[in-house]
Each structure stands twice: as C-alpha cells, then as structure tokens.
Amino acid sequence: MAEFLHTMVRITDPGRSRAFYEALGFEFERDMDIVRNGELEATNYFYGIGDSRSVLELTYNHDGRTYDLGSGYGHIALALDDLEASLAALKEQGIEPEREPYRVREGGSLLCFVRDPDGYRIELIDRSGK
C-alpha cells in the first residue's frame, strides 16, 4: 500500500512563505540544509498540519535561480477550522482571496482561493460549518 508523504514547492523568500503557511495552521517540524561540494545549495523547511503524517516541504535554493509555476499545477486544498480567522491572519500579510468566500452548492462548505507568496494557488475550505 502506498502512503502520501509530502508535497514540495520551491520558494523565493523563506520568511514570507513560512509566515504564510504558519498563518494557515501549519506547524514547523524541522529544516535541513543541502550541501554539495562544500556549498550550501538549498534549505528545506518541513511543515506538518493536524494529525496528518504527510508534510509540506518548502525548498529555498540559495543560488538565486528563478522558477516557472508551469501549466500543469492546479492547487493545493486545505480544510481549515476557521476560514474567517485564517483569512484575517493572511490579510495582515497583505494577502487577499481571489474573490470573497463562496459555496459551490447550497449547504456546502465555504471556500475561497488565495495565492501564496510565490504564486501557488491554495484552496481554503472552511470545515467549521459556518
């Protein structure tokens, strides 16, 4: 049987990215420097969320290279205990939802989409039943 372990995204500003994901309830677990030929190449920041054993790996490359999100990436979806509080925390960082939270169907959960500091689209789903 397979097990989902982690999702890795490349980041350009560790401070901004870490603050973004921490505002959504991710908990910092550890970091790991990648050194090749005596040179610091990358730093990986690992974050867990809730009871899940899978983690989010934020990778910062120290060589300054740039990245393209590509056309195949869609989004990461997160279920949150309190969407309103999470959006307020993100607003303090200057991050606004693409549009106001909405329901896909009557009686369904409230949801919205935001972009993290590197432009990755994140779906936020309120599981509080509000």
PLM features: residue spans?
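Core segments of cupin and vicinal oxygen chelate
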Residues: A2, M8-R53
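Eukaryotic phosphotyrosine signaling hubs
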Residues: F4-H6, G72-I76
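Helix N-cap motif at beta-to-alpha junctions
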Residues: D13-G15, L80-E84
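Short amphipathic alpha-helices within nucleic acid-binding modules
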Residues: F20, L83-A89
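Vicinal oxygen chelate
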Residues: D31-I34, Y45-F46, L78, L87-K130
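Exposed loop/turn and edge beta-strand positions of beta-sandwich/beta-sheet ligand-binding modules
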Residues: E41-T43, G72, G108
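Short, charged/polar surface micro-motifs in flexible loops or helix N-caps
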Residues: G50-S54, D63-R65, L83-A85
